[in-house]
């Protein structure tokens, strides 16, 4: 064989080695990051996430998304707020933006932060996903505006839903019945929601 063939074979071998090595490193680092999140080892997570190698292997949004999940597990409200603000400024595709907005909306709903929810609701509306916006608006109205007009609609939907969806609807029903002053039905749906969430 001549030298050109040897050179080409060597180049192909080195390229394959680089590709496989990069994949291995990516998987290894990703598993390390996930283990830190599972074990709530935020300091180790930060150390790995902020390393040069991790920054070379992963797009910035992916690293920031993992950081957000770590802060959510830790319950550090200040860092969570900062992370959502930072990430919502990223130039994201529609799917990623939608996912992030819903995650932020659910978080701020759970914290009963009306101001943040109202702001995020406007962003959700700008996505032009009518059904998604209507669902988010419904939650906002029930939780913050003490709306009770969805009781019949939600109760009729319960029969056709899986456990996770049932749990969420039952939670919203418990709030509506609480708003109506019916503590028996509110407690019933609260208990049902807990049963279907596990």
Where is each model-derived feature located?
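N-terminal topogenic membrane-targeting module
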Residues: 22-96, 120
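Generic helix N-cap/helix-start motif at coil->alpha-helix transitions
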Residues: 21-31, 56-65, 93-102, 128-138, ...
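Alpha-helical repeat scaffolds
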Residues: 43-52, 76-89, 113-128, 149-162, ...
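Alpha-helical oligomerization segments
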Residues: 170-198
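N-terminal signal-anchor transmembrane alpha helix of single-pass membrane proteins
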Residues: 1-32
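Alpha-helical transmembrane segments and their immediate juxtamembrane interface regions
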Residues: 89-115
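Residue at a conserved register position within TPR or TPR-like alpha-solenoid repeats
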Residues: 36, 71, 108, 142-145, ...
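Soluble C-terminal extramembrane regulatory/interaction domains of multi-pass membrane proteins
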Residues: 133-159, 164-178
């Amino acid at each position: 064989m001549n030298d050109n063939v040897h050179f080409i074979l060597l180049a192909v071998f080195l390229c394959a080695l680089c590709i496989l090595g990069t994949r291995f490193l990516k998987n290894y680092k990703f598993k390390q990051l996930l283990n830190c999140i599972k074990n709530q080892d935020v300091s180790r997570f930060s150390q790995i996430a902020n390393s040069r190698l991790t920054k070379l292997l992963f797009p910035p949004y992916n690293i920031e998304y993992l950081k957000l999940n770590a802060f959510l597990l830790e319950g550090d409200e200040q860092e969570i707020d900062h992370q959502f603000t930072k990430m919502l400024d990223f130039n994201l595709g529609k799917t990623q933006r939608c996912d992030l907005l819903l995650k932020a909306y659910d978080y701020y709903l759970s914290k009963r932060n009306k101001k943040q929810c109202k702001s995020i609701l406007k962003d959700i509306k700008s996505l032009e996903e009518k059904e998604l916006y209507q669902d988010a608006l419904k939650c906002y109205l029930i939780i913050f505006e003490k709306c009770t007009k969805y009781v019949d609609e939600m109760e009729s939907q319960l029969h056709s839903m899986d456990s996770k969806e049932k749990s969420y609807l039952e939670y919203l029903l418990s709030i509506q019945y609480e708003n109506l002053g019916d503590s028996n039905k509110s407690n019933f749906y609260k208990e049902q929601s807990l049963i279907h969430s596990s």
